Curated annotation (Swiss-Prot):
Cofactor note: Binds 1 Mg(2+) ion per subunit.
UniProt-listed Gene3D superfamilies: Alpha-D-Glucose-1,6-Bisphosphate, subunit A, domain 3, Alpha-D-phosphohexomutase, C-terminal domain
One GO biological process term: UDP-N-acetylglucosamine biosynthetic process
Superkingdom field: Bacteria
EC code: 5.4.2.10
Record protein name field: Phosphoglucosamine mutase
Cofactor: Mg(2+)
Record: active site: S102 (phosphoserine intermediate)
Listed NCBIfam families: glmM, PRK10887.1
């Protein structure tokens, strides 16, 4: 397959105002996508966004491009990414488009697509869009131009769907929880879901202003959530990222509960109910402690490459239903078609309520190995991982760890970062080995 020119592992993403996230390019992207999608069916797309200030500009650019290709667009306004996937299916649209850079800062943004089935676009469709992008932009005749309209009941529809995934025999009455929406797309959705199911909720990160998305709140920074859970003496806390496809939780003692632990709780609960279908998919970043804990329960486990796209591929390949990344992407294919943080939260909470155990107690069956993750920013086209210095440092650490740990070095698919992960049984040695590799990477940048 030809190499992608524009699409990364999660759509098209970058710094707003710089290629490819400019009004001109996004308008042409809308047109190119419209040209490809128009050949497939209803000529209707659902478009959602997170709360970044640039979303308004990019929304208008997309609208112009899609209209020029003859497609109708329905806009949801701020809406979680998984909500757009769900609404794309229920409205029988040809595609869903999300304007978001997920967990990134406000000055980044991106465009990602869903198929009519609410899944990531197939590779051949992405390549077809890329081919159109290299052609001159044209416009259909005036009578065939696309129209745009607002989808006014999008939030209510999605709230009801989320609630439908929570067992009818259970209630959140008596549950006190803190909800952190990262000043992002879940700010008007998640609090209502939990409140309508009976919980007492305290909210943080629910006042978006266009530039505060993911800033010191949300799934990528749970310090505010940890403090609030302790201050309010809450049963637990839930943090989402800017577009609502990542979840991190906090127990009543302020301990962070990551995507690995969340998947473990959900899988173990499904096993207890006799409803587990197959095993669990993790990634190369998944903690070895999860692999060991699942093995102890007799639950199969496999690793995919990093990225929810690859977790999904492994799930479909094995016909399994539960997959996760430790960063908080949790995919539950018996309920949704993509990572959905609110739905994942509800399944963990159902386990808490149904078992009458605390979140901390539910995590006790899994012991996390000490793991150090460092991100090193680099500039230019040269990949530091290709240097002999970095390769030698990695080989040395792997020899020292033997079978009692892992090293993973990778280039981010969405940012100019080198990610260094070292994992092992001894926390002090893991930190020391990670520093050895980080120094080599920095010297090679």
């Amino acid at each position: 397959m030809a190499e992608r020119k524009y699409f990364g592992t999660d759509g098209v993403r970058g710094l707003v105002g710089q290629s490819p996230i400019t009004p001109e390019f996004v308008m042409k992207l809308g047109w190119a996508a419209g040209k490809v999608l128009a050949k497939q069916g209803t000529k209707k797309v659902i478009i959602g966004k997170d709360t970044r200030i640039s979303g308004y500009m990019l929304e208008s650019a997309l609208e112009a491009g899609l209209a020029a290709a003859g497609l109708k667009a329905k806009f949801t306004g701020p809406m979680p990414t998984p909500a757009v996937a769900y609404l794309t299916q229920t409205f029988r649209a040809e595609a869903g488009i999300v304007i978001s850079a997920s967990h990134n800062p406000y000055y980044d943004n991106g465009i990602k697509f869903f198929s009519s089935e609410g899944t990531k676009l197939p590779d051949d469709v992405e390549m077809a869009i890329e081919a159109e992008l290299d052609k001159p932009m044209t416009c259909v005749e005036s009578a065939l131009l696309g129209k745009a309209s607002r989808l006014n009941d999008a939030a209510g529809r999605y709230i009801e769907f989320c609630k439908s995934t929570f067992p009818k025999e259970l209630s959140l009455a008596g549950v006190k929880m803190v909800v952190d929406c990262a000043h992002g797309a879940t700010y008007h959705i998640a609090p209502n879901v939990f409140k309508e199911l009976g919980a007492e909720i305290i909210t943080i990160g629910c006042e978006p202003n266009g530039t505060n998305i993911n800033h010191e709140v949300g799934a990528t920074d749970v310090r505010a959530l940890q403090a609030k859970v302790l201050e309010e003496k809450a049963d637990f806390g839930v943090a989402f990222d800017g577009d609502g496809d990542r979840i991190i939780m906090v127990d009543d003692l302020g301990n962070k509960v990551d995507g690995d632990q969340i998947a473990y709780i959900i899988a173990r609960d499904a096993l207890r109910r006799g409803e587990l279908k197959g095993g669990v998919v993790g990634t190369l970043m998944t903690n070895m402690g999860m692999e060991v804990a699942l093995r102890n329960l007799g639950i199969p486990f496999v690793r995919s490459n990093v990225g929810d796209r690859y977790v999904m591929e492994k799930l479909l390949e094995n016909n399994w239903k539960i997959g996760a990344e430790n960063s908080g992407h949790v995919i539950l294919l018996d309920k949704v078609t993509t990572g959905d943080a609110i739905v994942a939260a509800l399944q963990v909470i159902a386990s808490i309520v149904g078992s009458k155990m605390s979140l901390k107690e539910l995590c006790n069956g899994m012991t996390l190995f000490p793991q150090v993750l460092e991100n090193i920013r680099f500039v230019g086209d040269n990949n530091p991982l290709d240097t002999e210095l970095v390769k030698a440092a990695q080989a040395d650490v792997e020899t020292k760890l033997g079978d009692n740990g892992r090293v993973l070095l990778r280039k981010s698919g969405t940012e100019p970062l080198i990610r260094v992960m070292v994992e092992g049984e001894n926390a002090e040695l893991v930190q020391q080995y990670a520093l050895q590799i980080v120094d080599a990477v920095k010297e090679s940048c």
